[in-house]
Amino acid sequence: MAKEYSRTQRIGDQMQRELAELIRREVKDPRVGLVTITAVDVSRDLGHAKVFITVMGEETPDAVQQSLKALNSAASFLRLHLGRSMQLRSVPQLHFHFDESVSRGVHLSALIERAVAEDRLHKDADESGTKE
């Protein structure tokens, strides 16, 4: 059976695709680096949309803040273009946020790899100690 999506999820998915293209094509602000839109959460009343981004390359807090500042200042411009490309009566207000899940995932992967390496080291030490 096909998974059912709510209207807000479908609108969020379409907004994610449209915004990625608009940012790549229309936003000329040098503060905006290589931005990837990871998710768009649209409120039930379609009044607001949280746009979650990551910044590839430079993930320093300063670069992230500069990109967020530039995107939030371009939000009305992007909203206008979204209104032209999407068939919506009203386009949600855009609020850009940094998505920390990617960096958290990388950190957790590194912790897991380190734990596995330590386990192997202890296992090898135990095996070499019992053979003698």
UniProtKB/Swiss-Prot annotation:
Q: Where in or outside the cell?
A: Cytoplasm
Gene Ontology biological process terms from the UniProt entry: maturation of SSU-rRNA
Q: Which Pfam families match?
A: RBFA
Provide the alphabetized UniProt keywords: Cytoplasm, Ribosome biogenesis
Query: Which one of the record's GO molecular function terms can you name?
Result: ribosomal small subunit binding
Q: Name one GO cellular component term.
A: cytosol
Q: Which SUPFAM superfamilies match?
A: Ribosome-binding factor A, RbfA
Q: Does the keyword Secreted apply?
A: no
InterPro entries for this protein: KH_dom-like_a/b, RbfA, RbfA_dom_sf, Ribosome-bd_factorA_CS
The keyword Cytoplasm belongs to this UniProt entry's keyword annotation: yes
Which PROSITE patterns does the protein's record reference?
RBFA (PS01319)
Describe the function of this protein. Answer: One of several proteins that assist in the late maturation steps of the functional core of the 30S ribosomal subunit. Associates with free 30S ribosomal subunits (but not with 30S subunits that are part of 70S ribosomes or polysomes). Required for efficient processing of 16S rRNA. May interact with the 5'-terminal helix region of 16S rRNA.
Q: How does it assemble?
A: Monomer. Binds 30S ribosomal subunits, but not 50S ribosomal subunits or 70S ribosomes.
What protein family is recorded?
Belongs to the RbfA family.
Q: What name goes with this protein?
A: Ribosome-binding factor A
Q: Which lineage is the organism of this entry classified under, starting from the top rank?
A: Bacteria, Pseudomonadati, Pseudomonadota, Gammaproteobacteria, Pseudomonadales
